[in-house]
Amino acid sequence: MSSANLSIKENGAMVVFGASGDLSKKKTFPALFSLFSEGRLPKDIRIVGYARSKIEHEDFLDRITQNIKIDEEDSQAKEKLEEFKKRCSYYRGSYDKPEDFEGLNSHLCEREGDRSTHNRIFYLALPPDVFVSVATNLKKKCVPEKGIARLVIEKPFGVDLKSAQELQSQLAPLFDEKEIYRIDHYLGKEMVQNLVHLRFCNPVISHLWDKNSISSVQITFKEPIGTEGRGGYFDSSTIVRDIVQNHLVQILTLLTMETPTTFSADDLRDEKVKVLRRTRLGDLKDIVLGQYVKSKDGKKPGYLDDETVPKGSRCPTYSAIPCFIDTERWRGVPFLLKAGKAMDIGKVEIRVQFKAAANGLFKDAYHNELVIRVQPDEAIYFKMNIKQPGLSEAPLLTDLDLTYSRRFKNMKLHEAYEALFLDAFAGDQSRFARIDELECAWSLVDPLLKYMEEEKPVPEPYEYGSDGPECLYSFLKKFGYIYDSPDYYDYPVMSVPSDH
């Protein structure tokens, strides 16, 4: 039975592969509980955690609920949590033995009970090297004869264009493209979802959204922690694979795509693919690659101090990458993708700087900027000039500030995984990457990955807890960004998140 565009409203089950991992306890199960408590999941939902670790049932329940926060005085919330735990179970198995998947299918059937159809979502929070063996065994042993089957796959999908294509060639005979949901959790974040509405619901913004009005665009990811024991994994991934190729490129496409015919999943992704195919890197020698060293006070170690990192590694933990889009709308506008670990603060934001007024009447006016803060403290603010209050005629820089926590005090903003899991049950693929979209993203960064592998450039050092390499200022200046915020200007208040 085809699963295209069909919503799973009953007879639903979800298998969480990698259920013993940190992502499972920190994000996956809290998101599923939130949806369950709001009645957004199928009313008869069954959730099975699957991993290789030996975990007793009660220990598993304790593990998956330790990050779920409820009001202990709220009896209804406590009842919901207990009911949720009854819907969850654990099954231990390997990722390559058919008999373990046969056992999983029996476990699912037992949990599901007497159903006329079996609608199953298989969520793979696993290393890419086991995707194919898991998908193969699922197809043979666990895909129902009557019902819907969907494969939800966590990033990374490959490590470059070639590996992504090889992986897809092995998955394609097993699951149709309409059954594969490739997750980039940034597409579930509130402010990333909001980009489409911001651009296409507001004519005042739409009319300014091109090379005639915009001088530069920055997409910035800053994380305040380093690799902290994950250096072995990160060293093979690099900041380019870990953050730029997926999160930042996805944001770039939503910022720059043309108006889709409709907001159906394929129409939306068609436009993203079109703009990606016209996107290219700037000169490789203009790219800033950095690696953090110990903090100024010596309390935080450098990247090479991590025992899991290979000695002498030149893996970049920071990158600033210029991109250009060869379309009539965007030709000549630099898009600067900046990402780094062990930074001064944690934030993800989009900064659109507009060109100076052409009339020349106010030579001391400041540049307008539209800033979209993805996290923390979701916000949109527009930096603008007004007359300085009082008798002066001098321009004063201020902003129109839409900070969500102040404007929408009684409205819950759902976590990214909540939105994405809900879409997976609904059969909506618009916030999941299609294979040609992923291929374009890898094609974009592949020249940089090849340059890093072959030339092994020495990364610029920057202190743990700093704003990045010292050459960053000259990089931004070269690509037209103008620092002109006066000392008196106070940026909207922001807190620092612990993760991304």
Swiss-Prot record:
Q: Provide one Gene Ontology cellular component.
A: cytosol
UniProt xrefs under InterPro entries: G6P_DH, G6P_DH_AS, G6P_DH_C, G6P_DH_NAD-bd, NAD(P)-bd_dom_sf
The protein's predominant localisation is cytoplasm
Q: In which pathway does this enzyme or protein participate?
A: Carbohydrate degradation; pentose phosphate pathway; D-ribulose 5-phosphate from D-glucose 6-phosphate (oxidative stage): step 1/3
Q: Which reaction does it catalyse?
A: D-glucose 6-phosphate + NADP(+) = 6-phospho-D-glucono-1,5-lactone + NADPH + H(+)
Protein's UniProt keywords contain NADP: yes
Q: Which residues form a coiled coil?
A: none
List the keywords (alphabetical).
Answer: Carbohydrate metabolism, Cytoplasm, Glucose metabolism, NADP, Oxidoreductase
The protein's name in its UniProt record = Glucose-6-phosphate 1-dehydrogenase
**What organism is recorded for this protein?**
Schizosaccharomyces pombe (strain 972 / ATCC 24843)
Give the gene that encodes this protein: zwf1
